[in-house]
Amino acid sequence: MTIDLNVIQSDIISARRAPENSLFIDGKFVSPIEPAAKPIPLINPATEEIIGTCANASAKDVDSAVENAYNTFRSGIWAKWPGKQRGLVLRKIAKMMREKRELLAGIDTINCGKPTPYALFDIDSCADMFEYYAEVAETDNPTVKVPLPNNPGFCAFEKRFPRGVIGVITPWNFPLKMALWKLVPAIASGNCVVLKPSELAPWSCLEFALICKEAGLPDGVLNVIIGSGKESGAALSCHPKIAYLAFTGSLATGKKIMHAAAENIVPLTLELGGKSPLIICEDADLSLAIPSAAFAIFFNQGEACTAASRLIVHESVADEVLGGLVSEANKLIIGNGLDPQVTLGPVVSKTQFEKIVSYIQSAINEGCKCVVGGLPRSEQKGYFIPPTVFTNVQTHNKIWREEIFGPVLAVKTFHTNEEALELANDSEYGLGSGVFSTNPKTLEFFSNNIEAGMCSLNNYHVVTHELPWIGWKHSGLGVGLSKHGYNEYMRLKQITQYVG
């Protein structure tokens, strides 16, 4: 049976309920007050065709959204609700997300190109996350009595409060999932949010906003603005009524946001780039390590901040590992993410496509050896990059040092564990890492000494909302996900009382 992908795409677009070129403010879809420019065209990266447009909000729209969120927060609706009451709404949102999973996943696929099974997984994991944070909110005790044995005339408490208006700026690689990683703990803890998703893939966030309204989230708790980072993102970053900023994106943009936040002394979390190392030791179970290494770089077209783009493999097993990687790369089915057989979709945009191609060309020019993949076919429609592996890589090569954000793997060999550790830590980034070995002491050595916020042993890597998401070095600040992430969106007060 032939699948008509054009019909599938048309059905997804027709099923959307968010009006074209709209923002979501105070529980309503609205047009920009004063657009910064013409609407932004949205392109399906698998076909290079324009499938619609989105709003291009100005600073005035940002101000409207923030003022609305601020007034909503100050009113006490939501912020002063008991955690159990907020939890009921969060659980209703989870239920409705599951009911709309095919639509939400389909929107993300036509916006950013990811294969449908991965997009569906994203939506399912987000619904699970709502359930998790519903339980956190329901069971959280924000007031804790602190014993003062040296001050018997006093009683003391630590009390946590929601911060206020949270500004959230998120990327295009996981359009809805990255937004909800920040949004869910923020609203679960009683805050109001102004969300600016990427203008390359904004539709699922707008559709999600309507789900929240229908689930009973009070108007003004979630506001969504769409526009360029230069205009609306910058305005959100420096708005004086923002109490906290949460950003996921590039290191360069993260530095700008940190500078803007500093002007108002606004705390923030930053999840920035990565150049994550994966180490395969001589005693590793290669039947596990090889497919894991392939998945770690080729998943989501390599458009993941934790993509293991540096493979450090023991010289004694290097040939077998490389042969296995070539085999795994050749198994991938490249094509339109709407096709259920596809396992590697296009990268998100022409800009990203050209950037990745330039890295591949740079590696070739610098003498690296391409063992699979390489430059894409020039006549091919769509922003497709073949899964690519380079050996003969030097540590000064761009593909070893810089984040590519595509399905491009750089491989180096090592002789001793100390040498592997030095290679792993020779990076400005410190987000993800992984080690494959059957020796517990080897695993302990690497997990204790790799300079990264997350380390996966004999896997790569478990991403779950129960565990904290942490970037070291230039990979970020603060903590996402888990109860630690929930507490990031709350401020702490010390209360003491004289009791005689």
Swiss-Prot record:
Highest taxon, organism lineage: Eukaryota
Residues annotated as the enzyme's active site: 271 (proton acceptor), 305 (nucleophile)
Site for Transition state stabilizer, residues: 173
GO CC term (a single one): nucleus
Gene Ontology biological process terms from the UniProt entry: cellular detoxification of nitrogen compound; glycine betaine biosynthetic process from choline; meiotic cell cycle
CDD domains, A to Z: ALDH
The reaction(s) this protein catalyses: betaine aldehyde + NAD(+) + H2O = glycine betaine + NADH + 2 H(+)
Top-level EC class as recorded in UniProt: oxidoreductase
Binding site for NAD(+): 249-254
Record's keyword terms, sorted: Meiosis, NAD, Oxidoreductase
The keyword NAD belongs to this UniProt entry's keyword annotation: yes
Gene: meu8
Protein name, as recorded: Probable betaine aldehyde dehydrogenase
